A protein has these predicted regions:
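Extracytoplasmic small-molecule ligand-binding "clamshell" domains
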Residues: 39-116, 128
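Acidic, polar ligand-binding/catalytic clefts
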Residues: 29-30, 81, 85, 93-159, ...
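N-terminal export leaders
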Residues: 7-16
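Periplasmic-binding protein-like
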Residues: 58, 137-148, 212-257, 276-291
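N-terminal secretory signal peptides
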Residues: 1-7, 20
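Short helix-initiation/N-cap motifs at beta->coil->alpha
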Residues: 94-106, 188-198, 236
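A ligand-binding cleft/hinge motif common to bilobed small-molecule-binding domains
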Residues: 103, 119-129, 180, 197-235
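Extended ligand-binding regions for polar small-molecule ligands
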Residues: 36-37, 81-82, 86, 148-149, ...
Length: 291
């Protein structure tokens, strides 16, 4: 009985390996699978067209910006490569539609683009207008500091009390947001993100309150000039957006993103995460899915 069970398990293990290998070598391409989707689904239309139209921007590093050769790069752009690879086994099979952030939702709903990948925060208001994919990044607010600064860590900033100075982009909740983290800090509100960071560069403040992705990007570019205080708060989810009502298209994109973030086809995602945030992805384990 025990021997039979062991033999049976051996066959299952062997079969499992065989199936996994078969999945790598001979998985059904998306184009062949399109026959299973609804005739009205965008999935079928995109596959028939031969490329996916991606709405994004071009002026916001590290998300979407032009490199020294004029090529669009960034974490959002990497997600477009991932989607194109999932669709056509060709990470270059897409067309970028460059757009203003204000055009993100209109361009989805008018059909100008198939999907928007443009550092779009998921919230309940937007979710009434478009359908969001699974998140591909968790953003937050952080304190960008200097490695030679007197108060480069959050602990030292907190201990500095009213002597600690922080710059932040001007908005109605700016001062309150800082004081929730540093109750006694002096808050310098400025009109542009560039000026917020310039205040740190010039020594007018001890820290600049910016997106965590900005902190990671600048620290990756200039570790001699910028440091991460180690403190972050107010988490926000970034996801891609598609038109509502097309379950086949949404589920396909989700599946492609899941495999890129959590599964085996993670080369593009991992490289982009390191290139633009300076961090290596670790912790993927077999067994219980962390999704």
């Amino acid at each position: 009985m025990i021997e039979n069970d062991i033999n049976r398990r051996g066959l299952l293990i062997g079969g499992g390996v065989g199936l996994a290998a078969a999945g790598i070598a001979a998985s059904m391409g998306a184009k062949q699978a399109a026959a299973q989707s609804s005739p009205d689904s965008l999935l079928r239309k995109v596959l028939d067209r031969g490329k996916v139209r991606v709405g994004t921007g071009s002026t916001n590093a590290p998300w979407h910006f032009e490199d020294t050769n004029g090529k669009l790069v960034g974490m959002d752009i990497a997600m477009a490569h991932i989607l194109a690879k999932g669709l056509f086994d060709d990470p270059e099979a897409f067309e970028f539609v460059q757009q203003d952030p204000a055009a993100r939702i209109p361009n989805i709903n008018t059909g100008k683009v198939d999907i928007v990948v443009q550092f779009m925060t998921i919230n309940s208001g937007r979710a009434q207008l478009v359908a969001f994919t699974r998140p591909y990044y968790v953003e937050s607010i952080s304190f960008l500091t200097r490695p030679d600064g007197k108060r480069k860590s959050f602990e030292k900033m907190l201990a500095g009390g009213s002597d600690t100075k922080v710059s932040i982009l001007q908005n109605v909740d700016a001062e309150e947001n800082i004081h929730k983290q540093l109750p006694k800090a002096q808050v310098l509100m400025l009109d542009t993100q560039a000026n917020v960071i310039q205040a740190l560069d010039s020594g007018r403040v001890d820290a600049a309150a910016v997106d965590l992705s900005t902190t990671r990007w600048l620290r990756k570019l200039r570790p001699d000039r910028y440091e991460d205080s180690g403190h972050r708060w107010f988490s926000m989810l970034y996801g891609a957006a598609v038109r509502q009502g097309d379950t086949d298209w949404l589920k396909f994109v989700d599946s492609v993103f899941d495999v890129a973030i959590y599964g085996h086809d993670n080369e593009i995602y991992d490289k982009a995460f390191f290139d633009f945030f300076g961090e290596k992805i670790t912790g993927r384990k077999a067994g219980f899915p962390p999704i």
